Each structure stands twice: as C-alpha cells, then as structure tokens.
Amino acid sequence: MSDTEQLRQAVQAAIADNSFCTLATSSAANRPHVVGVLYAAVDGILYVSASDASIKARNIAQNPRVAVCIPVWQQHGLPPLCVQFQGTAEVCALHDPRMVALLQTGKLDAITGHGALDIPGSCLLRIAPGRRVATYGVGVPLDELMRDPLHADRSVVLS
C-alpha cells in the first residue's frame, strides 16, 4: 500500500472514529464564528445537531463554506494531532428525507440521543469535506513526530 493510501485511510479513520470538532463558519457579512460541536460521521459526511436560530446554522444558511478541525490525539510534550479541512455545509430540516433515513437507521444516535431534536427549531447540519484534507501528525510515525514536529503536516485527496 502506498504512503498516500495509508494516509488517506488514516484520515478517513480519524474522521470516523472521533466525535468532536471545531466548526468555523462565516456570515454573509464575513463575520467569522467558531464553535466546538459533537458530530456523527456517516460515509465521510459530518452531521451536527443544532438550533436553526444558532449562529452556526444562520451563518451556514447565508454562506455554506465552512472549515473543520478535528483533534485526534495528544501525547504529552507534543501538539495535538488533528485533521482539518474546508468544506460545504447545509442546514437540513428534520423532515428532509435524507435526514429521516439516517435517523431511522440510528446512524445519528450519537448526536441525537440526548433529546436535542425534541427542542423546537432543531435541525441538522450536513458538512461535506472538500477534496483535500490537511493533517498534523496523522500518519506520521511517533519517532519522526518527536524528532521533527515542525514537519509533521501532510495533506491528502480523499477521492
């Protein structure tokens, strides 16, 4: 397996195996906003529960371009490993057929199991990563990361 394919698999696993990220949005007036959110990953797409009145949902409705940073792992003495990407997002109503299917199959239980969708105005955010994903430390051998942490950045095309 090539180094590129190994990195691609490591990135896909990091996205699938984690559940917290920071989500950066910007309003139509270019006012930035960043917030930590829980997510569920389904087939490489991130889903976040939100209120349609929240800043993140309002910003996405105005401007679908987002950025995401997923902290992956931290070793004492080293910066946290992470996956980051730019992508597009959309605000989805709970009755959207795509969301209904995911909810019925339980694929979004990790973000909906605590009653978040029972609140009036609840919605789901659907975040699709762009083609290229950047990383820090992901797929880098630990000895190399410790020896040369300034050169532990990588990027890969997801497909």
Q: Residues of each region from the PLM?
A:
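Charged, gly/pro-rich active-site loop segments
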Residues: S2, P79-S159
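Short, basic/aromatic recognition patches
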Residues: S2-T22
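Short beta-strand segments
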Residues: N18-D52, V68-V72, L81-Q84
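Short helix-to-loop capping/linker segments positioned immediately adjacent to catalytic or ligand/cofactor-binding
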Residues: L23-S27, Q74, A110-D118
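Short, solvent-exposed aromatic-acidic interface loops
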Residues: S51-I55, T105-G106
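Helix-adjacent hinge/juxtasegments
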Residues: I55-C92
